[in-house]
Amino acid sequence: MKVFAIQSSPNRDGLTSSLAQSVLKGVRAEGGTTELIHLNELNFKHCIACDNGWGICRTEGVCILEDDFESIREKMADCDAFVFTTPVYFGDLSESAKVFFDRLRRVEGGKDFGSFKGKKTIGIASAGGGGGGAVRALYALENYLRRLNFDVFDLVSVTKFSKDHKLEMLERAGRRLASE
């Protein structure tokens, strides 16, 4: 099984990244292959709502903006499962996660959202504070994942207070994901 993780925190070595790494460790323990990318290190532009707002992507199946988005989509096409991690900012996804999902939903909308149908996904929202907005952020992430037809394997909210036992749980989730 090949699992692709997309991490959307500007802190490559922080809590959000460690959560993705924990899932991927479990996947590798079961013989799976993994890749992790950090959205904030890539060149991403926001959707410009081209073609009178509907987007050329909906008819052409690709985004016309020249950045790293299409190369990520190509990598995603070859994967069996996904992990999406985002820090929680004011009860919502990170800015880079929102930009990524806004563009992905537009391109996939022209394909009747079929590219990811049945592909298992773990969504993780990590809050650096007490976690008051984590559930709202996780709800937003779930909304994107379900509308894009991912098969949501698990949704996990994590705070700085729950990280130790959640890291262990996420490694087990990665093992289970890879064994299905």
PLM features: residue spans?
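Short, glycine-/small-residue-rich phosphate/pyrophosphate-handling segment
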Residues: 95-96, 110-154
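N-terminal beta1-alpha1-beta2 submodule of the flavodoxin-like/Rossmannoid cofactor-binding fold
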Residues: 1-107, 152-180
